[in-house]
């Protein structure tokens, strides 16, 4: 597949912008494997189209098990639909692809962020990482991140057998930094108010947005 497809321009005011979570906005995190036995990539992209149409704060294409070339091809498709709905597109893991696509941001595992030279972290958009301790939060600040994802906060099928870190950890993480902190792990409409009350800037949802009723639209349009 050719990756030279033209990307429609994004409105300048929407670039690099994650809306405040007090309005009920969430970051959508992808998992294409949820569609392995349910329509494959075409169904995955169709669902993402629905998610983007509901105007989440951003879409993170978290398909880090792919080869970078294949990831870039898929990322371009996802970026196109994000731009169509004026939703920020955040790449995951692959800094080279993020730069070539002029992504609105890049999310890196902290282990990968540590090994990246400072000039490699100089991206045009947001830079984020995932934190699982207060030490991670401090390190992420020093490495130049502009937002953090903290988790996992609640029990989730994505982390079977691992106890959640809970709202206390989220509260401490949010209080320890001026950076916006987004909660991940078991985020549902019912739990969003708890996350915000703990000081988080918002939440991230994967399985609950990629499958079943699309509750994001109701959250974004109260």
Briefly describe each language-model feature range.
Residues 200-202:
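Internal alpha/beta core interface subdomains
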Residues 160-164, 183:
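Active-site-adjacent loop and "lid" segments of alpha/beta metabolic enzymes
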Residues 1-107, 111-113, 121-147, 162, ...:
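Conserved N-terminal beta1-alpha1 strand-loop-helix module at the mouth
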Residues 186:
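Conserved donor-binding loops in enzymes that form glycosidic bonds
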Residues 166-168:
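Conserved acetyl-CoA-binding loop-helix of GNAT-fold acetyltransferases
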Residues 112-117, 156:
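A short, polar/charged loop-to-alpha-helix boundary motif
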């Amino acid at each position: 597949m050719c990756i030279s497809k033209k990307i429609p321009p994004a409105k300048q005011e929407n670039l690099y912008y994650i809306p405040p979570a007090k309005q009920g906005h969430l970051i959508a995190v992808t998992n294409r494997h949820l569609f392995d036995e349910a329509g494959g990539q075409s169904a995955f992209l169709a669902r993402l189209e629905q998610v983007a149409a509901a105007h989440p704060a951003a879409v993170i294409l978290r398909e880090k098990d792919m080869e970078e070339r294949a990831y870039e091809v898929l990322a371009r498709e996802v970026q196109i639909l994000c731009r169509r709905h004026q939703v920020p597109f955040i790449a995951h893991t692959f800094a080279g692809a993020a730069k070539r696509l002029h992504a609105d941001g890049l999310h890196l595992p902290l282990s990968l962020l540590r090994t990246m030279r400072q000039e490699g972290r100089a991206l045009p958009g947001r830079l984020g990482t995932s934190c699982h301790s207060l030490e991670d939060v401090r390190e992420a600040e020093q490495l130049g991140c502009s937002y953090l994802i903290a988790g996992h906060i609640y029990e989730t099928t994505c982390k079977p057998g691992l106890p959640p870190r809970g709202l206390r950890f989220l509260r401490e993480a949010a209080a320890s930094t001026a950076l916006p902190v987004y909660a991940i792990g078991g985020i549902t409409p019912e739990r969003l108010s708890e996350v915000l009350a703990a000081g988080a800037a918002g939440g991230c949802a994967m399985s609950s947005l990629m499958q079943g009723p699309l509750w994001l639209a109701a959250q974004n349009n109260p």
